[in-house]
Amino acid sequence: MTFRFDNSYARDLEGFYVDWPAAPVPAPRLLRLNRPLAEELGLDPDLLEREGAEIFSGRRLPEGAHPLAQAYAGHQFGGFSPQLGDGRALLIGEITDRAGRRRDLQLKGSGRTPFSRGADGKAALGPVLREYLVGEAMHGLGIPTTRALAAVATGEPLLRQEGERPGAILTRVAASHIRVGTFQFFAARSDIDRVRRLADYAIARHYPELASAPEPYLAFYEAVAEAQAQLVARWMLVGFIHGVMNTDNMTISGETIDYGPCAFMEGYDPGTVFSSIDLQGRYAYGNQPYILAWNLARLGEALLPLLDGDPVRAADKATSVLETVGARYQGHWLAGMRAKLGLAGAEEGDARLAEDLLEAMRSQRADWTLTFRRLAEAVTDEGALRPLFRDPAALAGWLPRWRARLAPDAAERMRATNPIYIARNHRVEEALAAAHAGDLAPFDRLLEALADPFTERADRELFALPAPEGFDDSYRTFCGT
């Protein structure tokens, strides 16, 4: 099968990676192929159904593939690790999709690499299918994200903390896999030439309009800050908690990447944490905008020598960008919140209106997704929100203020903005448990709902319901891919 690879990272950035083959697997089996994505990439899904097990397991890569493990560093929970890199993943190449966009193809769970740091480099079935589900859920919500092209069972059992688990490999598609940590890897070694080469490559690939800017590296820094501020605002608007916002998990492209311990919040609480390794709550839901700024500061540090030859002026320029991050984020968040609330135009008191609703939701632990979805019904039915709030009077003072700001077509706009289906934790776990037992039908049904999250259907009612009371209080997520 022809993939039409054009591997610019391997060609232009020698020394930024290690050539490495995928580990052999005993009995690969294609579990799921993302046919719409395959077509978007200009690939033949029918051929991939037949040949995908061999290709996406790494056992028989297509002509032109160039498997490599990328080098990067990163701050993990605030502590700097000068060498991380692809410890269980291989970039196999780049292709141009039907829209003319360059896309990376990466195998996750393909075995040890020189960056594995003692791990086996493999991925278990559950985490692979989880990333597939959540990535497609984010895509359905219109949030920039890496996506899953395929999931392959390897036929190899893996020993994990919870016992023996079947092995699997995810084929991930991304605008690129360049991270804040990629810049940090070379900056930590004072290799300014490679920092510059990486910046030039990233500009050419993601922000080509900046190449002719008076200060292209400063403009690049601003562009990444803008892309990430918009991304994190969109996470917050749907109640998404990434769970591991390390600098090696922040892309230059502005896509969501690495879904290991992520989850969607149900009852609204800014302190919500699901990740089993986030013991201090560093990456809690409400902290994500602050970590956004912290991570961008680390990118600024890596770029300092490119911003100006004078260290003081370079620091001033980086600071001038960082000082805009809060306003950038707030602007995107407020614009999104106005849409979620169905407001007409923009008025000065809109932020307070939104914050007052959130405070009422917090005090009642109201379900994030259903509250905003049922607001569309509350345009004409005051009782629509009562089942979601323990205190029926919680919104008594807020509702008249909100109604006074509504656009004429508010209900219709709100239903197109506020999803009815998200990847609720208990439904994801049910789908994964069934998959472990050999039944992928629940996975398929959930995936179908998540691909169309704004269209409410009677036969999907179960996917809209919150978890049983107490489920999320003890629910924990893990870094599995």
Swiss-Prot record:
<feature type="binding site">
    <location>
        <position position="258"/>
    </location>
    <ligand>
        <name>Mg(2+)</name>
    </ligand>
</feature>
<keyword id="KW-0460">Magnesium</keyword>
<keyword id="KW-0547">Nucleotide-binding</keyword>
<feature type="binding site">
    <location>
        <position position="179"/>
    </location>
    <ligand>
        <name>ATP</name>
    </ligand>
</feature>
<protein>
    <recommendedName>
        <fullName>Protein nucleotidyltransferase YdiU</fullName>
        <ecNumber>2.7.7.-</ecNumber>
        <ecNumber>2.7.7.108</ecNumber>
    </recommendedName>
</protein>
<feature type="binding site">
    <location>
        <position position="249"/>
    </location>
    <ligand>
        <name>Mg(2+)</name>
    </ligand>
</feature>
<keyword id="KW-0548">Nucleotidyltransferase</keyword>
<feature type="binding site">
    <location>
        <position position="121"/>
    </location>
    <ligand>
        <name>ATP</name>
    </ligand>
</feature>
<feature type="binding site">
    <location>
        <position position="172"/>
    </location>
    <ligand>
        <name>ATP</name>
    </ligand>
</feature>
<keyword id="KW-0067">ATP-binding</keyword>
<keyword id="KW-0464">Manganese</keyword>
<feature type="active site" description="Proton acceptor">
    <location>
        <position position="248"/>
    </location>
</feature>
<dbReference type="InterPro" id="IPR003846">
    <property type="entry name" value="SelO"/>
</dbReference>
<comment type="function">
    <text>Nucleotidyltransferase involved in the post-translational modification of proteins. It can catalyze the addition of adenosine monophosphate (AMP) or uridine monophosphate (UMP) to a protein, resulting in modifications known as AMPylation and UMPylation.</text>
</comment>
<feature type="binding site">
    <location>
        <position position="87"/>
    </location>
    <ligand>
        <name>ATP</name>
    </ligand>
</feature>
<feature type="binding site">
    <location>
        <position position="88"/>
    </location>
    <ligand>
        <name>ATP</name>
    </ligand>
</feature>
<feature type="binding site">
    <location>
        <position position="120"/>
    </location>
    <ligand>
        <name>ATP</name>
    </ligand>
</feature>
<keyword id="KW-0479">Metal-binding</keyword>
<dbReference type="GO" id="GO:0005524">
    <property type="term" value="F:ATP binding"/>
</dbReference>
<feature type="binding site">
    <location>
        <position position="85"/>
    </location>
    <ligand>
        <name>ATP</name>
    </ligand>
</feature>
<dbReference type="Pfam" id="PF02696">
    <property type="entry name" value="SelO"/>
</dbReference>
<comment type="similarity">
    <text>Belongs to the SELO family.</text>
</comment>
<dbReference type="GO" id="GO:0000287">
    <property type="term" value="F:magnesium ion binding"/>
</dbReference>
<feature type="binding site">
    <location>
        <position position="108"/>
    </location>
    <ligand>
        <name>ATP</name>
    </ligand>
</feature>
<keyword id="KW-0808">Transferase</keyword>
<dbReference type="GO" id="GO:0070733">
    <property type="term" value="F:AMPylase activity"/>
</dbReference>
<feature type="binding site">
    <location>
        <position position="258"/>
    </location>
    <ligand>
        <name>ATP</name>
    </ligand>
</feature>
